């Protein structure tokens, strides 16, 4: 009951319904993470309490951003163990989710999670964001692109903004010190057709975690040359 109450309280804070079905799905997901983490490197966070707070509640906090609540489709880029895409799907069943990751072992794990939790309207893609963002079925097709991946904001923006339709949003889940990244990325975001609309500070109760949600609105279509070829983006971020 302790974990149920913690998760329910976090959902209440962002006006999300929470029930036994969602709780059981999250606990099953936690158990699968712990089981599979013995075989492949999914996360350094493995204790029950830490998974609940540092992964699940961190993902719940993204619903503080109103675009998530209104979205019909979302792509999670560099999803890793499925964060934040899987928790978003569990908590908002009507959204269509695409999970993108470059490592096949993680995709195999995510497909197991999807099957075990009986999640619908969710797919996994194995490959590079740079490649999929040039494909017609994915380019500028999503209401929301989100990423919790570890990369600077200029790099993440070039990976993610091309997936977002005009009028949609890219939401970057960043750490506590984001000011320098924002300053360095502002021009690249503009080049890609976006503009920073909001920066939301996130505190995770009973932990030392402090995060920021950087909310970027897509104002114009992204030029055809972006994203650039694999390898170039990290070596030469847009300025």
UniProtKB/Swiss-Prot annotation:
Pfam families: GidB. Keywords: Cytoplasm, Methyltransferase, rRNA processing, S-adenosyl-L-methionine, Transferase. It is found in: Cytoplasm. Its main location: cytoplasm. The keyword rRNA processing applies. InterPro entries: rRNA_ssu_MeTfrase_G (IPR003682), SAM-dependent_MTases_sf (IPR029063). It comes from the Bacteria. GO terms for molecular function: rRNA (guanine-N7-)-methyltransferase activity. Its EC number is 2.1.1.-. S-adenosyl-L-methionine binds at residues 78, 83, 129-130, 148. GO terms for cellular component: cytosol. Gene3D superfamilies: Vaccinia Virus protein VP39. Specifically methylates the N7 position of a guanine in 16S rRNA. Belongs to the methyltransferase superfamily. RNA methyltransferase RsmG family. This is Ribosomal RNA small subunit methyltransferase G.
């Amino acid at each position: 009951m302790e974990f149920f109450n913690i998760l329910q309280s976090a959902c209440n804070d962002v006006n999300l319904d929470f029930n036994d079905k969602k709780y059981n799905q999250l606990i099953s997901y936690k158990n699968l993470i712990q089981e599979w983490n013995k075989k492949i490197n999914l996360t350094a966070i493995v204790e029950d309490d830490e998974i609940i707070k540092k992964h699940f509640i961190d993902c719940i906090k993204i619903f503080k951003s109103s675009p998530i609540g209104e979205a019909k489709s979302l792509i999670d880029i560099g999803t890793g163990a499925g964060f934040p895409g899987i928790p978003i799907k569990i908590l908002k069943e009507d959204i269509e989710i695409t999970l993108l990751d470059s490592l096949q072992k993680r995709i195999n794990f995510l497909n197991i999670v999807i099957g075990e939790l009986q999640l619908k309207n969710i797919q996994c893609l194995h490959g590079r964001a740079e490649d999929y963002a040039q494909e017609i079925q994915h380019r500028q097709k999503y209401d929301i692109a989100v990423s919790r991946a570890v990369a600077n904001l200029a790099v993440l923006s070039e990976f993610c903004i091309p997936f977002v339709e005009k009028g949609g949003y890219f939401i970057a889940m960043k750490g506590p010190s984001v000011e320098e990244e924002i300053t360095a990325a502002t021009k690249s975001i503009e080049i890609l057709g976006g503009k920073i609309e909001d920066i939301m500070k996130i505190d995770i109760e009973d932990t030392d975690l402090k995060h920021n949600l950087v909310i970027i609105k897509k104002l114009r279509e992204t030029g055809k040359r972006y994203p650039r070829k694999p390898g170039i983006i990290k070596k030469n971020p847009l300025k």
